[in-house]
Amino acid sequence: MFEDLTIPRIWPIGAILFNLLFLLIAIPIEGYIYHRRLNFDKKTSIFYAIAVNSFSGVIGWVIFFFVEPVLPVPIKAELINYIFFNIFRSTNTQGVLIFTTFIIFFSTFLMKFFLLRLFVFTLSEDIGKKQEEPQPFYRQKVRFISRIRLQDTNLVTTTLIANSLSYTAITIILLIRNR
């Protein structure tokens, strides 16, 4: 699989620049939503937005590069035409594109949620600190479970809102670009 690994002679500069543009659009929008809804300070919310979008972008490209070689030839041809020339040759490609867009949106949402949850848990300042006043075990367990449930619900809705707004902004830019 990796025997034919060479640097390509033709670079999809348009796709690379649009990916950079999408990151530059998504990070401030999602950082603002994290700041407002999760009550992070601005620096922390932007850090989480950068981390979540960077990791999800890298994971998305890795998935793309593993899926692309197994695609049927007509879909590969349409993909190459769209990436390099911004045109579709086939008329039924738009249905596949809409279906693929929904899959990408929800998989990105799930990826961002789990990444944000991982980052919030691992980068929390409360980990490793001693509690000043020990509480009874049962009370402590109930508080911890209720806090985790509330935090998960809040993270899910916040991630969904942030992802939806950033995808909406990106879609508007794509519509403006194609006119």
UniProtKB/Swiss-Prot annotation:
Keywords: Cell membrane, Membrane, Transmembrane, Transmembrane helix. InterPro entries: FraC (IPR054663). GO terms for cellular component: plasma membrane. It is found in: Cell membrane. Pfam families: FraC. The chain crosses the membrane at residues 10-30, 46-66, 96-116, 156-176. It comes from the Bacteria. It is a multi-pass membrane protein. It comes from Nostoc sp. (strain PCC 7120 / SAG 25.82 / UTEX 2576). This is Filament integrity protein FraC. Involved in filament integrity. Required for the integrity of cell junctions in general but is apparently not directly involved in normal differentiation and nitrogen fixation. The keyword Cell membrane applies. The keyword ATP-binding does not apply.
